[in-house]
Structures are given as C-alpha cells and as structure tokens.
Amino acid sequence: DLSHGTPMGEVLTILLFCGAAMLAVAAFERFRLRRFWSRRCTGAEWRRAFPTAPKAEIWTFLDLVLSAFAFSQSKRLCLSPNDQIMALYQALYPSLLRAGDAMELETFAISFQEHYGVDPLPVWREDITLGQLFSYATKGS
C-alpha cells in the first residue's frame, strides 16, 4: 500500500514535489530566455556587422558563449551581435538567483582567453555586447 503516512508514500510525495518544482523552474527559465530563443536566424546581422569574418569563425565564437552557459548549439543563431552578455546572464539568473550561478561568465572568460589568446577582462563592461567581444577577439586576425 502506497498510502500517505507510510515511508514509501512519503518518498513518493517528495519525489513528485521535486519533479513538479523542476518542471516549474525549467518553464520559468524558458520564459526568461524567450526574447533570445524566439528570434529568427541572426546570421544576416552577424554578416552585416562582420562582413569579412568567415561564418565558421562567428559560429566558433557563438559556440564559446553557448558552451559557457550550457545552452544547445542549436541556439547559435538566436544570439545577435547587439546582445549584451550580461543581459543573457541576467535572463538566466534573475536577481534573486544570482548567488547560485554556475560560473558561466568565468567559464566564458577562460574559454575566450584559451581560444583567442587574449584576456577579455581589460575590455569588459556591464554593457559589452557579443559583437564587441567578437571584434576584440578577432582584431588581430
């Protein structure tokens, strides 16, 4: 019997509650990131902003961003050169959740430096855009 009050019933209740909480958090995350993920392909924006940059180079940069935030590569061309990296971070972590982040910005900075051989911190600002970071990363190319 799996009725309430038994150890098995209590475990099932806890598991159901945890599952419902996880679903609610995932739905809330999708809602907060919707302004990025609901876009059509931003490839033309990247090509206009960086007409001489090879597509593969732009994609590699975007993949660094997506990887640092643990987002799917299928979201690559949902990000615009005008997007601020902090806006992406703030959409993922509303002010109440920021204390428990997964070090996405630190991971991005390390990956950026490893891949491009330049430290992004000297140019980092609260309002820095992905396009500005890409330009800084590829200025010597």
Describe the residue ranges of each PLM region.
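Phosphopantetheine-dependent thiolation modules in NRPS/PKS and related acyl-activating systems
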Residues: G5, G9-E114, V118-S141
